[in-house]
Amino acid sequence: MDSGATSFNVLGEWRRTVQSKLLGERHVGFVAEENKLHCGSIKDRDSVVLTPIANIQQGTVNYNHMFDNLIWVSDVQFMEELQYTLISSPFLNDIHHHQMPLSVANSIMDFHRDRRFHRESFIFSVPTKLGYLKARYGDKKLELRKNINFMDVHKTVYSILKHLRNNNKKCTWRILSVLMIILYLGYEQAHFHNQYPKYSFLTQLKAMMGKLQQFDSIQRKYFENINITKEFDKTGNEIFQLLHSITHIASMKLYHLSEFLLRFTNIGKLSKYCGVYGIDMNLAYLTNVRILTSTKQELHLLQDKIEFLRKFLLCCFLSVEHQDYNEKVKNIIFSTYLLKLFPGYTEDNNCKSLFSSQWSVLSTVIVKFNQDLSFLYSVLNENKELIYSTETREESETDEMLKERYKFRYKDKNQSLMLKALSQIHLVEEQLISVQDADDNEETKCLINDHIKNLQQLILCCNNKTNSGTNFSNRHTSLQGKGLFLDVLKSPEEKFTPIFQEMEVSRIGIKNVSDNDDLESILTDNENYEHIEPAHFIDDRNNGGAFTIYEDSTCYADDCYKNASELRKLNDEQLRRKLNEKIQLFATENKKNRNQIRQQKSLELLRSNSTLTALNELKSNTNYESLDKGVKTKKRAHFMEQELYSEETIPFYYEINDFLYNQANQ
């Protein structure tokens, strides 16, 4: 019995109460008084089972209180800790900084009892009263396996006790003591493994409360910065779109979790908790109305919806069914509000499953919700740099300080496009969810198609931005080859025109000007264009044909674009109108310059016709050195030949020949 004594040293002092039928027709109750019966003589055979196991071995262990207060019957402590975890949360309690902490020592999850054995060395496998504890080498995890089947032990002990009733031998007491130990360990293991889903649920619930607090704290920082922002600039719009999308997704996750949890709740208790914490179900129905616009008012409405659903979710956890299905109190008014708020809910969907499986299902659902909430928190945490860039510009600040402050905004040009795409995605999701009537299908399909088209345009724009560098380089490499290039300003034959030998022309592309993301950066980088003077170029061969051309691209901007601050004050309509005027101005100047260059080249061709005869004579004469100018004349003839027979001058050459032929026929 030394091994049995060691085992009960591990168990410690347990005081529990139980009333059970071990033999079917007799109640077994163990009392704490000493047994005065002697081991040799048993006067009453029926008193064998009723006799407490005491003084089996003198001076070893007192087994009188072994079956007192078995905890497998009562779940009061679990429900109390569950209620304390929910009620003491900051979402239901405004004075949460005054709450009393719940230490692990006072929790039902404290399994670290006073164990004096195996403290000095690490054991890879330890037999305990809760099962066989094994340690994995690779994963470094502990695994608890059940080594006693409660039903088999119960049947075996019952059959042995039935045979021992007619046995009066001395060894009967020793056999009876071993049977009681095995029966007690079977009760303990059955209780623990039945309670394990509740322990897991309570752990996941506390983790969910922590994640909700983290998400709420970082979300409030975003809301505070939006409220103090005076002007909605580019960064403010990005914050608004990001916060709107994340808030909408979080509200939908809370909504679906609350709707699923209603199947496990007691509606009578839920109505009482909603009354205690001031949850207005009529207001909740108004906040669930579908919203198709993205405004500041809608954002605050979504925030109110999240606060309501968060409180409602905790009240649902407080009113979870706990073996009291007969104690339901029907509330017709409250059930009507629930049907309006959750159309998929019906009272027939209440879960009637076993108590243990109920907590395991809820634990699995909370794990999935915690993963989604962690993802939303990580998105807000990664973009928290946007919070510190919404300050408005002061008058004393210079343009250099402004560029330094908004420098990080242009590192990733696709960020705003991705935020817009995320907004379009959640609008499509909202349309799909809000379809209820058959009459609204056509209108809803049109709205969904519009959102999908906008999303496709955003994706194409994002792809064009990523591939703009490679396309630009390929376009310039193709100019170096032979062929007829139709763009006069970027023709490869410009190097033969003297007017382009001493100046450089740089323009703002129309595509770049139409891009709102790059327009501000272009203007802020070139803010000194008003101090540039025009450069005059005179063509010697045209005898005084002077014209003016600017060397800086920003000279084509209007006065309203001189300062970047004025640009940010323009609304969408004004910016679009200015942009159209700018495009028209560039088109007019481009057409004018093309006409001037075409006229200049035509004059050059007419002058080259007068030298055609001299060119033929130069070709017939093999000795170029006989001419007066010698080598210089040879180089000039080669230049004139290359200029005359270049691919770009061929159309003009045929036009002149047709003109001369028509003049001769007249």
Swiss-Prot record:
Keywords: Glycoprotein, Membrane, Peroxisome, Receptor, Transmembrane, Transmembrane helix. It is found in: Peroxisome membrane. It is a single-pass membrane protein. Signal peptide: none annotated. Belongs to the INP2 family. This is Inheritance of peroxisomes protein 2. Required for peroxisome inheritance. It comes from the Eukaryota. The lineage of its organism: Eukaryota, Fungi, Dikarya, Ascomycota, Saccharomycotina. Its main location: membrane. The keyword Cytoplasm does not apply. GO terms for cellular component: peroxisomal membrane. One of its GO terms (biological process) is peroxisome inheritance. The chain crosses the membrane at residues 171-187. Glycans are attached at residues 227, 414, 464, 471, 512, 563, 609.
